[in-house]
């Protein structure tokens, strides 16, 4: 929680205004932010200075793990996070590759589970990583990436948190996640939950101990219509201690994550928070 608030204060005090063409808004911006999450000791990085809806964040990443490409599938898991980008993004609505209502195109999990080769075959990046880690193998290339410039025109949004690298040291698994751009008041709340949970899940299904998760952000920003709420409301609040995340121990394989797992298999214990803050979302 401390490192999150320090980043917010850094943006408010040191950030520079940058115009964002996609949204038509200005962003108070800093370059390079490093966050670290202690998964080994279950220090779940859930924002406490405003109420955080953690289930939607985990549901979204579960959708990525399953390779979903439709906002309706994400809604069925319990999150509406893709509704706007799939159905209200002007550029995507005009894109001839869009296949109708709720279609997201070849984004995020589609690339992770079915990266297309020139011959038309696909690569399941996640399956390869799980197989290797289960066998105790770290080839220094246990990398899951959603960033495929050759298919940006086939999706509604370029990935923000785009690459996840796993490192196995002995029987302890670590994760380094890379993010090109981060809406700190809204997006980071989700992203840090996802980084933590991804490592916890991967350690569980590969039979390894979870270590630390490292979260590297290039462009961290606060939109101009979010600044007042961040500066005058959220940063005035004192944080509560971090809660813990409980994951159903019956989740043992990638197939489990692909099939029967729901949000009922996750529980947060000891969560205290201040009142919600409704930050504007930029499509």
UniProtKB/Swiss-Prot annotation:
Looking at the keywords, is Methyltransferase present? yes
Any one GO CC term of this protein is:
cytosol
- GO terms for biological process, alphabetical: dTMP biosynthetic process; dTTP biosynthetic process; methylation
Indicate the enzyme's highest-level EC class.
Answer: transferase
Residue sites binding dUMP per the record: 22, 180-183, 191, 221-223
Tagged with keyword Methyltransferase: yes
Q: Where is the active site?
A: 160 (nucleophile)
Pathway field of the UniProt record reads:
Pyrimidine metabolism; dTTP biosynthesis
Residues bound to (6R)-5,10-methylene-5,6,7,8-tetrahydrofolate are: 183, 282
Q: Which reaction is this enzyme known to catalyze?
A: dUMP + (6R)-5,10-methylene-5,6,7,8-tetrahydrofolate = 7,8-dihydrofolate + dTMP
Record-stated family: Belongs to the thymidylate synthase family. Bacterial-type ThyA subfamily.
Reported function: Catalyzes the reductive methylation of 2'-deoxyuridine-5'-monophosphate (dUMP) to 2'-deoxythymidine-5'-monophosphate (dTMP) while utilizing 5,10-methylenetetrahydrofolate (mTHF) as the methyl donor and reductant in the reaction, yielding dihydrofolate (DHF) as a by-product. This enzymatic reaction provides an intracellular de novo source of dTMP, an essential precursor for DNA biosynthesis.
How does it associate, per the subunit comment? Homodimer.
NCBIfam families xref list: PRK01827.1-4, thym_sym
Which named protein is this?
Thymidylate synthase
